[in-house]
Swiss-Prot record:
Gene Ontology cellular component terms for the protein in this record: cytosol
Xref: SUPFAM superfamilies: Trm112p-like (SSF158997)
Originating organism: Bordetella petrii (strain ATCC BAA-461 / DSM 12804 / CCUG 43448)
Superkingdom in the source lineage: Bacteria
Family that this chain belongs to: Belongs to the UPF0434 family.
Protein name according to UniProt: UPF0434 protein Bpet2671
Gene3D superfamilies, alphabetized: 2.20.25.10
Length: 61
């Protein structure tokens, strides 16, 4: 994911920072423990599409 885009995007729930998990193609909000999918290179920034992160910290690439 392009770093300029990543610097611009924020979590739609808390407006916090997102980290890109390249291996899973997801944008991670650690504050809300949500992972937003990136499909065909397009971030899907809908809370209804996000999955809940496990209690263990996720690795980012």
């Amino acid at each position: 994911m392009e770093s300029r885009l990543l610097d611009t995007l924020v979590c739609p729930v808390c407006k916090g920072r997102l980290d890109f998990d390249r291996a899973r193609a997801e944008l991670l909000c650690r504050a809300d423990r949500l992972a937003y999918p990136v499909r065909d290179g397009i971030p899907v920034m809908l809370e209804s599409e996000a999955r809940q992160l496990d209690a263990a910290p996720a690795d980012t690439a």
